[in-house]
Regions:
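Rossmann-fold scaffold of SDR-type NAD(P)-dependent oxidoreductases
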Residues: 12, 79-87, 109, 136, ...
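Catalytic Tyr-X3-Lys loop
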Residues: 98-115, 135, 152, 159, ...
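Short, small/polar-rich loop/turn modules that mediate ligand/substrate recognition or access, typified
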Residues: 173-175, 227-228
């Protein structure tokens, strides 16, 4: 008998930055990948050409989230992992609706993972002990808070807590962990002054790039024991 086909890894928000890097990493390993995307960046076509299944999704409504889940179910009978990378970064600003800001942050960071984890759990289960994974991408601000991004920080804190609840619910078949990054890589338009200020906030004084996160994801996927934990990738910021 031949080996069973590899189950795809689902990455939400796979069109940019860390999500895009993770998608290419697994594709380079010849592992099937499904990505969600909101905006048709040129990178999405590159992922298609590399072999990824790319599904446009609107996570701003529960209906959009559940419709995406149905598309995933119609694409594959099983999943190796779900990496919840889709995110938005919205600040409280004068003249904007505070309730709308909070609702938007909760929708993308809490409702989407919550509904997708429930909707897709059967695709992750049934493959053996610790054979499935869910990884939530939270944020360093969960630990320290943020005076300019209160709703964002609160929504990521809810996602962090949800990690432990889903770990309890889905063990031992599925491991559920979180990664809390800070300043992994800069944007192209970040000026030199901003970059230096950001680097000074950590003990390690670098922006390590996507590989630091990719290596941690690889570790979590290969572990048969680690679940319900949050892994800080912040260069020692809390110690400053």
């Amino acid at each position: 008998m031949g080996n069973a086909p590899l189950r795809p890894i689902l990455i939400t928000g796979g069109g940019r930055r860390i999500g895009l890097a993770l998608a290419h990493h697994f594709l380079n390993l010849r592992h099937p990948v499904i990505v969600s995307y909101r905006t048709e960046y040129p990178s999405i076509e590159g992922l298609r050409k590399a072999g990824a299944v790319c599904i446009q999704a609107d996570f701003s409504t529960d209906e959009g989230i559940l419709a995406f889940a149905e598309k995933v179910k119609s694409t594959t009978a099983g999943l190796r992992a779900v990496l919840h990378n889709a995110s938005a970064w919205q600040a409280e600003k004068t003249g904007t609706s505070l309730s709308e800001t909070l609702s938007a942050m909760l929708q993308i960071h809490v409702n989407a993972p919550y509904l997708l984890n429930h909707a897709l759990q059967d695709l992750l289960r049934g493959h053996g002990h610790a054979a499935g994974d869910i990884i939530h991408f939270t944020d360093y601000v969960v630990e320290r808070g943020s005076d300019k991004h209160i709703a964002y920080a609160a929504s990521k804190a809810a996602l962090d807590n949800m990690t432990r609840s889903f770990a309890r619910k889905l063990a031992p078949e599925v491991k559920v962990n979180a990664i809390a990054p800070a300043m992994i890589l800069f944007n192209e338009n970040d000026d030199a002054e901003y970059r230096q200020q950001a680097l000074n906030k950590s003990l390690m004084k670098i922006a390590p790039g996507e590989k630091e996160v990719i290596d941690l994801v690889d570790y979590l996927l290969t572990s048969c024991y680690v679940t319900g934990r949050t892994f800080a990738v912040d260069g020692g910021r809390p110690l400053r």
